[in-house]
Amino acid sequence: MKTRYFILILAAFISLQGCSRKEDNFAYWAKEVNVSITDNSLRAQVTTTFKESCSYRIRYWENARGERCARTTSMQTGLKGENTCTLIFLYPETHYTFEIIVEDRAVSKRVEFLTGSLPPDVPSYSVDYSSTNDEPLTGYLLQWNANKPGYVTFCDYDGKVVWYQSFGEGIRTAHYNPHTGKLAVMAGFKYGVNDRNFQRLVSEVFVCDLYGHTFFRRKAAEGFLPHLHHEFKTTDDGKMLFVSNFIKAFDLRSRGASTESTDVWGDGFYLCSEDGKVEKSWDCFAELDPIATDYLDPVKTATDYIHANSVEIDSNGDYYMTFNRISELWKIDGNTGDVLYRLGVHGNVSLDGDFPSGGLHAAVALEPDLIMCYANGRDKGYSEGVVYKIDPVAKTATYRTRIVLPAEYSSKDRSNMQKIGDDLYFMNSTVCGKAIFVNGSGEIRRVISRSGISYRAYYFTM
């Protein structure tokens, strides 16, 4: 009897071993692998025909640099039949090798491919300056070009383009959310409004990923938020956040208007669902009455009253906006819409130093009431990267960080700033076309120049 049981156990073990050996063989799972470069020179489409459903990843690397620089895709769900996975962040005209790993056990033969050339209109980038203590970073810079055909790009720390996409029109702004993998893009100019406003209003918005899939595309027109400008981003839960003009008629004859009704183009924001339904809207007019606000001339500024340029939401669900004309940062209650404080010369917060002047852009909430901005300093002749710590109850604020840029790296308008390390910041100076890596003491580590205009730029570790 014991001998019989032993034989049965041995047979089962041999059977399992045989099954294991089969499943360790890539040919057990797949029968065909192909790779192609199609409509985008820096996207490689790997098509695998699986015999059985499975999970798989693709590991790939640049031949010249070897496997030490390999990237691996996220885990993919492979269904029986043909499956496609797209490889991204590739250099142009470069030889690569990849292998497919199925169920973390079976590995395919290695396959080589060659990427294509960049289209001639893709923006170019170059390193202008690198300090002696500069350490290479492995992330990528998101930048774009305001001219047609409207390319959004990622480049590496040396300015080499590794990703691009054309949107047909000049790119006004773009924002990538690494949590969702979504790219939010504003493109085109809104003609037919007036000479002042067409310069900032956009004609179309997109939400897409980095693999060529578009999830949302809509014209900025009646029926869908016709006056969008300056800022569009997706939140971590997939919603869409926009800066927009809000137009309201006022009787400004007491302020010098010649007619009874004047349209004032104020600003605010929209929060929308993934399919474009408005869930929340807010505008500035309850806080700033054009008739009563004496430090602004509402007749002269009617077509662009306070010029909002950014909107941000913090972890508590409250909002922050920057306004360029008045150089102010506002915090807005996410539930009531009340303005909780205003940091600026005409605001209600006292600051342990001079207030921002000559332009303020791109609020980033490092945490609630710890807000980073790019202070343009048109009246000073130099720009600053600033972080404010605001006490919303006492209405006081202090400078936590204040980085002064040299005049040649400053930008009198537009621009933005990021904190990308414990003591490392990225600053995009739009007017001079520079992407600047700098520490908290103002020591510049690297400067990358670009062709064309990129309203903002961002650094991401992928």
Identify what each model region corresponds to.
Residues I7-S15:
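Bacterial N-terminal signal peptides
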Residues L16-S36:
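Bacterial Sec-dependent N-terminal signal peptides
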Residues S36-R43, H95, V102-M462:
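Histidine-/acidic-rich catalytic cores in large beta-rich domains
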Residues A44-F50:
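Aromatic/hydrophobic beta-strand junction motif of beta-rich domains
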Residues F50-S55, N145-P149:
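Short proline/glycine-enriched turn/loop motifs at strand-loop junctions of beta-rich domains
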Residues S55-T73:
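Extracellular low-complexity, O-glycosylation-prone stalks/linkers
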Residues G81-T86:
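Short S/T/G- and acidic-enriched coil/turn segments that sit immediately N-terminal to beta-strands
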Residues L87-H95:
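Surface-exposed, short loops/turns at beta-strand junctions within beta-sandwich domains
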